C-alpha cells in the first residue's frame, strides 16, 4: 500500500458521490469537460462531484506528458472554471514524481480519504474494453463501479459493449 501523504481534496466532506475521471490532460480540452458533465447528467448522479485526476504518467503510454504538470493543472483549472461540482485532485502528480501511477492505487487512496463517499470511475469505452490489462481490474470495479462513456472511434452498441466487457474477464454480467 502507498504510504505517501494523501493530497487533500477540495470537495466538501458531505459530498456523497465522487465521479473520478483520470487522464494526462496533455493539454486539457473541451473533450475532457463536456462529455464528463454529460455523463454525470445521463447517469442520474446530478449532485455528484467530478474529480479530475491528472496522471503523472500513464502506464499505458510509452512517454510522459509534453506539458509540465503545473501547466496541465492550470489549463484544467481554467477549463473547469464554470463547471459546478468539479475539482482537480493532484494526488497522482504529487506522489508520482514523473513515474507511472495506477488507477487502483489512486482509488485506494481516495477511499482512505473519503471512506463514506460512493466512488464511480468514469472511463471511455475504449478503456473499458482494455480494463482487463489494468492493474487489479476486479478491485477497481469493486471500489468504483465504472460509468462508461462512448467516444469517437469506438463503434459499438450497448449489447456489443456488454458482451465484449464480459469476454475480458474483468467484468461479470451483472456489472
Task: Identify the function of each model-found stretch.
Residues 1-175:
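Nucleotidyltransferase catalytic core that binds NTPs
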Amino acid at each position: 500500500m502507498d504510504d505517501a501523504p494523501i493530497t487533500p481534496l477540495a470537495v466538501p466532506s458531505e459530498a456523497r458521490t465522487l465521479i473520478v475521471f483520470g487522464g494526462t490532460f496533455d493539454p486539457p480540452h473541451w473533450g475532457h469537460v463536456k462529455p464528463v458533465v454529460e455523463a454525470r447528467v445521463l447517469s442520474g448522479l446530478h449532485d455528484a462531484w467530478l474529480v479530475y485526476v491528472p496522471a503523472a504518467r500513464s502506464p499505458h503510454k510509452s512517454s510522459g506528458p509534453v506539458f509540465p504538470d503545473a501547466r496541465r493543472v492550470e489549463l484544467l483549472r481554467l477549463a473547469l472554471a464554470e463547471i459546478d461540482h468539479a475539482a482537480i485532485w493532484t494526488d497522482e502528480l504529487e506522489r508520482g514524481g514523473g513515474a507511472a501511477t495506477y488507477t487502483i492505487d489512486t482509488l485506494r487512496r481516495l477511499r482512505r480519504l473519503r471512506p463514506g463517499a460512493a466512488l464511480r470511475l468514469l472511463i471511455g469505452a475504449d478503456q473499458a474494453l482494455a480494463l482487463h490489462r489494468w492493474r487489479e481490474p476486479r478491485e477497481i470495479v469493486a471500489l468504483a463501479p465504472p460509468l462508461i462513456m462512448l467516444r469517437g472511434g469506438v463503434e459499438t452498441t450497448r449489447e456489443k459493449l456488454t458482451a465484449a466487457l464480459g469476454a475480458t474477464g474483468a467484468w461479470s454480467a451483472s456489472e
